[in-house]
A protein has these predicted regions:
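Active-site substrate-recognition loop segments, prototypically the cytochrome P450 B′-helix/B-C loop
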Residues: 1-6, 18
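Conserved polymerase palm-domain catalytic core
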Residues: 10-178
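Active-site and adjacent loop segments of nucleotide-processing enzymes
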Residues: 178, 182-187
Length: 187
């Protein structure tokens, strides 16, 4: 709770996962708003492969260092990231990812993925993100295809994440868009 207020005010407004006062219902409502009111009815549904297990430690530290200057806090963060996992009866070092179930892990993921959120916002793309569930909403198929190319390039090249090409797709909301277990239609 000490670190969260440093980042929270500047997170992208369409980021909903693991944030105070926000929920999956809010994320669904925002997606419906973009589709129904603003006619952003071409939707990229992005799937990231093992997102939380593949967060790059150096990039995490770099993003935290932009706001936190206390070296002891950054050192603790690095120790947390590299604390390892139990496999059977022995401890294995972790070179990537954020420990599952860690108290600060959701914040780490949001800080990490906020770079993507802000990148897309700066280019005029409308997104809704709940943790690693990402929708990009566009007014045309060509716009959605462009957004997918831009997003995939940034996620893979800059954030070192993997977009699951077989599970990522573009759909029109007339056909329904599944998001957080709910199917959203144009009307």
């Amino acid at each position: 709770r000490i670190i969260e207020p440093i980042f929270e005010p500047d997170f992208h407004p369409s980021s909903y996962g693991y944030r105070p006062g926000r929920s999956g219902h809010h994320a669904i409502g925002k997606a419906e708003l973009f589709i129904r009111r603003y006619r952003r009815d071409w939707v990229v549904d992005m799937d990231l492969s093992k997102c939380f297990d593949t967060l790059n430690h150096d990039l995490i530290i770099r993003q935290f260092r932009q706001r936190i200057t206390d070296g002891s806090v950054l050192s603790l963060l690095r120790q947390f990231l590299e604390s390892g996992v139990m496999v059977g009866f022995h401890l294995e070092e972790t070179e990537l990812g954020s420990p599952q179930g860690g108290v600060i892990s959701p914040l780490i993921a949001n800080v990490y993925l906020d770079a993507f959120d802000q990148f897309m916002k700066a280019r005029g793309h409308r997104i809704v993100r709940y943790a690693d569930d990402i929708l990009i909403l566009s007014g045309s198929r060509a716009g959605a295809e462009n957004a997918l190319r831009v997003a995939q390039s940034y996620l893979e090249d800059e954030l070192k994440l993997t977009v699951n090409a077989t599970k990522t797709h573009i759909a029109h909301s007339d056909d329904g868009v599944k998001f957080l277990g709910v199917v959203i239609h144009t009307k």
